[in-house]
């Protein structure tokens, strides 16, 4: 039978974990001195005078590489726990993981054919 009080620890932890950052940002916003000036609006490069403009437009290739990296990084996050418990889960979970990997391979082939991985 589903009893709501079994999850009291979870809800307590969730509320505390949500309140700590909210309180930290609120207190720092109330206690921090407000000082606006021209230096506050200038860009910062490790204590050195900035060279050039602060707003630089990056080429789309950087974003494509970042997107492909994130996709395969997420794949690793999903597949590692599956690999650690492979012997317990059974054949059906193996087939699901295989479908997941095949979908990612199709995405990789698509990105490759579109030239997203070429740096010319």
Swiss-Prot record:
Single GO biological process annotation from the record: photosynthesis, light reaction
Enzyme class (EC, first level): translocase
Transmembrane regions listed in the UniProt entry: 9-29, 64-84, 88-108
Membrane topology term: Multi-pass membrane protein
Pfam families attached to this UniProt entry: Oxidored_q4 (PF00507)
Enzyme nomenclature, EC number: 7.1.1.-
Compartment list: Plastid, Chloroplast thylakoid membrane
Gene Ontology CC annotation, any one: NADH dehydrogenase complex
Catalyzed reactions per annotation: a plastoquinone + NADH + (n+1) H(+)(in) = a plastoquinol + NAD(+) + n H(+)(out); a plastoquinone + NADPH + (n+1) H(+)(in) = a plastoquinol + NADP(+) + n H(+)(out)
GO molecular function: NADH dehydrogenase (ubiquinone) activity; quinone binding
Superkingdom to which the source organism belongs: Eukaryota
UniProt keyword list: Chloroplast, Membrane, NAD, NADP, Plastid, Plastoquinone, Quinone, Thylakoid, Translocase, Transmembrane, Transmembrane helix, Transport
Function of the protein: NDH shuttles electrons from NAD(P)H:plastoquinone, via FMN and iron-sulfur (Fe-S) centers, to quinones in the photosynthetic chain and possibly in a chloroplast respiratory chain. The immediate electron acceptor for the enzyme in this species is believed to be plastoquinone. Couples the redox reaction to proton translocation, and thus conserves the redox energy in a proton gradient.
HAMAP family with a match to the protein in the record: NDH1_NuoA (MF_01394)
PANTHER family: NADH-UBIQUINONE OXIDOREDUCTASE CHAIN 3 (PTHR11058:SF9)
Summary of subunit composition and partner proteins: NDH is composed of at least 16 different subunits, 5 of which are encoded in the nucleus.
Protein family membership: Belongs to the complex I subunit 3 family.
Protein name per its UniProtKB record: NAD(P)H-quinone oxidoreductase subunit 3, chloroplastic
Species for this entry: Hordeum vulgare (Barley)
């Amino acid at each position: 039978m589903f009893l709501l009080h079994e999850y009291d620890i979870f809800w307590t932890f969730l509320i505390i974990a949500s309140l700590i950052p909210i309180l930290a940002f609120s207190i720092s916003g109330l206690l921090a001195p407000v000082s606006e000036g021209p230096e506050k609006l200038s860009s910062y490069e490790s204590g050195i005078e900035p060279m050039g403009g602060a707003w630089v437009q990056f080429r789309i290739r950087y974003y494509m590489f970042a997107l492909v990296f994130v996709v395969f990084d997420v794949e690793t996050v999903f597949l590692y726990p599956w690999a650690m418990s492979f012997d317990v889960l059974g054949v059906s979970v193996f087939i699901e993981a295989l479908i997941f990997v095949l979908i990612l391979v199709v995405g990789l082939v698509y990105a490759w054919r579109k030239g997203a991985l070429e740096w010319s």
